[in-house]
């Protein structure tokens, strides 16, 4: 392969998780490179123990002289996370797997006043599609299970338009330079295909940047911090903390719902919600309502918008 296969994803997207799993199983690359803290690479086997998901990698640093505050960050994994499915699929085909992102302690805290073209592009898309927010837009465009075949090209086009010609802020440029070095190193081995799983915002830039990296015999080294203690370990996490509505900016709304969509598919997940949250035994006519209304809703909206309708009906009994 003369080019790495760079798969831009949205973190914790069931559709992207299915795509990543399918690509690794069909392409069988020798290297699977995943956006995640590279300081955990020496302990990556710990991720394959019998965990109860979600779990998270916690990376931290503590300055010994107290001159600066310490820093820490979590990298969470749920079953429906593309990164988690990449790890599992890579393990099954015995690919060499590495995390390729800078841990939080190696990332710059520099403030950048560059305009946020991502928000501008999102705003244009929301106006064009008349969607309420970026989560609804994402569902509308990508979480439809019937569109899985077209998903790779749709994602590539979407993220290319989203990134445009923006250089990114200082932090993203620093992270992308490090990730590009990892891709360049894997390609320079010239002994097998390379597949990269990264946030879609980074994908268009990494597809070009890796070519500019100098040759490296060994895997890229992490920067060192003077007078600081750094480390990382696995920790339990919670579904609530995965929710974008709880303040986790890289999350998806309603992570329990996302997990059900991953396990069962959209329609069965909606039926499961109806059964679980119905306060009383439903009559036959009540059970028939969604089966009659859903096709009508689909005529009015995109199919995946029915997920929201399912959810609302299950929790409140209300339908439009």
Q: Can you say where each PLM-predicted feature lies in the sequence?
A:
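Compositional signal for N-terminal targeting/processing segments
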Residues: 1-320
């Amino acid at each position: 392969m003369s080019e790495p296969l760079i798969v831009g994803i949205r973190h914790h997207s069931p559709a992207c998780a299915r795509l990543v799993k399918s690509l690794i199983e069909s392409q069988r690359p020798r290297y699977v490179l995943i956006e995640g803290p590279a300081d955990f690479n020496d302990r990556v086997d710990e991720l394959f123990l019998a965990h109860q998901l979600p779990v998270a990698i916690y990376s931290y640093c503590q300055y010994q002289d107290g001159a600066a505050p310490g820093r820490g960050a979590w990298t969470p994994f749920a079953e429906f996370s593309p990164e988690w499915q990449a790890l599992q699929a890579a393990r099954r085909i015995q690919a060499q797997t590495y995390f390729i992102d800078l841990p939080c302690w190696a990332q710059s805290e520099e403030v950048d006043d560059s305009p946020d073209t991502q928000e501008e592009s999102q705003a244009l898309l929301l106006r064009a599609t008349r969607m309420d927010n970026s989560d609804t837009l994402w569902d509308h465009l990508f979480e439809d299970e019937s569109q899985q075949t077209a998903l790779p090209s749709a994602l590539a086009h979407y993220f290319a338009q989203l990134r445009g010609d923006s250089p990114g802020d200082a932090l993203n440029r620093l992270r992308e330079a490090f990730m590009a070095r990892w891709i360049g190193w894997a390609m320079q081995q010239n002994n097998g295909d390379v597949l990269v799983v990264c946030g879609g915002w980074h994908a268009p830039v990494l597809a070009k940047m890796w070519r500019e990296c100098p040759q490296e015999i060994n895997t890229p080294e992490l920067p060192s911090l003077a007078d600081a203690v750094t480390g990382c370990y696995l920790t339990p996490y919670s579904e609530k903390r995965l929710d974008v509505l709880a303040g986790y900016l890289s999350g998806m709304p309603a992570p329990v719902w996302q997990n059900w969509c991953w396990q069962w598919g959209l329609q069965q997940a909606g039926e499961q919600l109806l059964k679980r949250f119905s306060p009383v035994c439903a009559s036959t006519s009540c059970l028939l309502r969604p089966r009659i209304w859903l096709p009508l809703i689909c005529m009015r909206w995109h199919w995946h918008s029915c997920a929201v309708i399912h959810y609302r009906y299950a929790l409140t009994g209300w339908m439009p």
